[in-house]
């Protein structure tokens, strides 16, 4: 799989429904935006279609965020998410929020894909996505 395919970058703006009582972006909204970046990656790599076909469900098992600066109403920001590595069970990703050239938040997440038989090994997922990108049929398992 191409390395650039493992990164999602989205440009966003803080909306009024993103705010907390302190009038900056709510910490929970940062996590929701991380979810949006994952969905973007799933769509662009073809993984979403495979997940639907194979009945695989993405599960975040751990997510940490460090908040460095607040994001104010209507402020523009960019969120980048990269899958940095995987092992026999988990995918590991980093998330970075930038505004005006400065890091405002960053975090890491650990995820699995669950199938009918339990956790789908990342190697199997990568193989299936690569085959799909190359136009090769992948059998349903």
Model-derived features: where do they sit?
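Hot-dog-fold acyl-thioester-processing enzymes
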Residues: 1-60, 114-141
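Hydrophobic beta-strand-centered segment that forms part of the acyl-chain substrate-binding groove
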Residues: 41-85, 106, 112
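HotDog/MaoC-like acyl-thioester-processing domains
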Residues: 71-78, 82-141
